[in-house]
């Protein structure tokens, strides 16, 4: 592959909530927040054929296969699927209000979603952005080659080489080939939540975080897009103030968000259906195999049988870095248990996360996901 083709495949990339009485709602989720966009795109593609090309034009695609070539793990055709889902934290353009522009985008949220054979169960493995890893060599946007290196923060992979480098880094870490890539943008996420009419969250304690602009009392709230973004970005209001507490907040919010999509009554208003489809497809970047409405429809349709009780969400096993308490290190043996299980299409064993600094349940004392 030429430097030019490599470069073409790489992209750089508060207020209080209103109180509501808790509602008794049966929980059913598809899998992760990016799949919300895919689910709405399904409806948009089938019910609004007249705007099919408009929605297609919204979706941004990147050719991961062309960028990475053959330097990838073996494709195991056992009926399962693995998807890398990223939330981009670019502070440029419309996203500038959410923090200082540091010159390039980084992956603020990273999840490996494993859908088991039969598409009735799934596991989600969150990767802390502050994890120090061995980052592989990657092509950059301007055609150069970044050599990678040891003790690199995980989220710098996206900064250096966009989606292709993020996928390559995850594949080198896990030994698992990613079947798909989905990226969700800050501004698009916020707009989608507003179009949905907000998402219900119950906080058991007050959350105050000036950095994410989140200010919530204990109780049940309907979060608008701004507040929802604050919730998934907050770290100082939960647990020890690290990225680990934020990950658990994100996992709890995903369940509430997807439940809201299920119950929102999409067919009650064609205008709302179109707006949701338009917002959802505008908010995401996918691999080239998913960057049209028809492909998203097929993809999301295969996930609709997965319910809340069929999904396991964990954080990649890690430990605090003795040299820097603001960073974490992979627990290599425990991580290997996770990757081996997913590669074999098996459940993640409890022993893999028992000794991890993550998954301690701190968020359960703050936000209810029931």
Where are these regions (language model features)?
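Non-catalytic, solvent-exposed segments at the cell envelope interface
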Residues: 2-370
